């Protein structure tokens, strides 16, 4: 069983912010594969289903971004999922241009507090990640204000395509090697 976790903040206030690209990608996967996100436990909102022959849990931690590791750890433990091979985390990255993807199998948090908390709760940094570019914050902007801000209309169009590509990358990570997925989507 795979756990595909999209990071974000719960609530309508944050739904369309830069920080919620993970949630939006999970919503796309949910719609595309008819997996209802209706279960609420382990500090998360999730649904179970099958994608291309693989059992999956689509997960949106409800702990707020900076505590995402609590929810993910609980789900992994409860369902006995191997985080090194069967956890895929989708999240925003300000070091990438809007719409650009970067697939990785391990690495530091790169300043992302949600990833930092996941690494803390897992005890290591080896898990599959899909970073979705949201663009660099403009000079003079507060980082929190930037990631909790909304995309421009032009950026939103680019982002819709990136959510589709991120969802495709998540599915590919269940079947293909890390190198194959990196070569196709990076």
Regions found by a protein language model. Give the residues of each.
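Nucleotide and nucleotide-moiety/phosphate-recognizing core
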Residues: 2-105, 116-130, 137-142, 149, ...
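Hydrophobic alpha-helical segments within soluble ligand-binding/sensing domains
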Residues: 111-114
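Short glycine/threonine-rich catalytic loop with a Thr-x-Gly-x-Asp
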Residues: 108
């Amino acid at each position: 069983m795979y756990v595909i976790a999209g990071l974000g903040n719960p609530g309508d206030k944050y739904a369309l912010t830069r920080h919620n690209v993970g949630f939006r990608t999970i919503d796309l996967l949910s719609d595309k594969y008819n997996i209802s996100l209706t279960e609420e436990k382990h500090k998360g909102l999730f649904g179970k289903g099958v994608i291309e022959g693989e059992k999956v849990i689509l997960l949106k931690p409800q702990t707020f971004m900076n505590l995402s590791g609590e929810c993910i750890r609980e789900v992994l433990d409860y369902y006995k999922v191997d985080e090194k091979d069967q956890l895929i985390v989708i999240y925003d990255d300000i070091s990438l241009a809007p719409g650009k993807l970067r697939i990785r199998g391990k690495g530091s948090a790169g300043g992302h507090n949600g990833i930092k908390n996941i690494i803390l709760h897992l005890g290591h940094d080896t898990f599959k990640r899909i970073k979705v570019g949201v663009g660099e914050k403009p000079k003079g902007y507060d980082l929190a204000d930037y990631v909790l801000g909304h995309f421009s209309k032009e950026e939103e169009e680019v982002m819709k395509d990136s959510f589709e590509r991120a969802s495709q990358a998540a599915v590919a990570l269940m079947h293909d090697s890390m190198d194959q997925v990196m070569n196709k989507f990076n």
